């Protein structure tokens, strides 16, 4: 089987997968995407005093402000998740979750930790795609009304979302000389570039979903660590943040790359 035949078979499989799952894939994508906010909101509830004391100690802001911060995080994240899953006021929910990301980036000093900053930006990319999807749903209500060609901010949201999502994979690159690490870096980088430029996008994004899910289950198996150990919370945080990026990639699979992409430009050539 030649290279073109192999690529064609893979694309046929991706198209078949999309046809079979198109009814529920967006719902799974949204659930995966908001999973890190859902988990963090629930954790805020059960670790209220620990989170409050951490903020108070770090910023020396006092009991009241620290408690207000934890409450805002808890309420903002759980409310945003409920709105996204119920498909109500999704755009407002996305803006609220963007605010939570920005707030946590500052409060937990993530701004100075490149790895966690890139993961937060990737999470923001997933929210951009969710925002683009909500705009698309709104426009579908007026399907019979003539509109301008897809020159709205939606296509640029999709582009920005794709570019930000690939930052997640940059945090997974290994800089040792083992064969597996080199192979993983080459394949991962190639797929990242394809998703970013929007070429063979659905196939590349679906491949990244499978690869990232396997890595996530293997390296972030928090359920194998006793709850009382700090590593349990650390791995759980990584696991659900990775699941959110997987949700963003599933939205790319479900919605396509948008107007600013190689796949779209090929149709005009």
UniProtKB/Swiss-Prot annotation:
It is found in: Endoplasmic reticulum membrane; Endoplasmic reticulum-Golgi intermediate compartment membrane; Golgi apparatus membrane. Signal peptide: none annotated. PROSITE patterns: SURF4. The chain crosses the membrane at residues 64-84, 92-112, 179-199, 203-223, 239-259. Pfam families: SURF4 (PF02077). It comes from the Eukaryota. GO terms for molecular function: cargo receptor activity. A motif (Di-lysine motif) lies at residues 266-269. InterPro entries: Surf1/Surf4, Surf4. Keywords: Endoplasmic reticulum, Golgi apparatus, Membrane, Protein transport, Transmembrane, Transmembrane helix, Transport. It is a multi-pass membrane protein. One of its GO terms (cellular component) is Golgi membrane. GO terms for biological process: endoplasmic reticulum to Golgi vesicle-mediated transport; Golgi organization; lipid homeostasis; lipoprotein transport; regulation of lipid transport. Endoplasmic reticulum cargo receptor that mediates the export of lipoproteins by recruiting cargos into COPII vesicles to facilitate their secretion. Acts as a cargo receptor for lipoproteins bearing both APOB and APOA1, thereby regulating lipoprotein delivery and the maintenance of lipid homeostasis. Synergizes with the GTPase SAR1B to mediate transport of circulating lipoproteins. Promotes the secretion of PCSK9. Also mediates the efficient secretion of erythropoietin (EPO). PANTHER family: SURFEIT LOCUS PROTEIN, SURFEIT LOCUS PROTEIN 4. The di-lysine motif confers endoplasmic reticulum localization for type I membrane proteins. Found in a complex composed at least of SURF4, TMED2 and TMED10. May interact with LMAN1. Interacts with ZFYVE27 and with KIF5A in a ZFYVE27-dependent manner. Interacts with STING1. Interacts with SAR1B. Interacts with TMEM41B. Belongs to the SURF4 family. This is Surfeit locus protein 4.
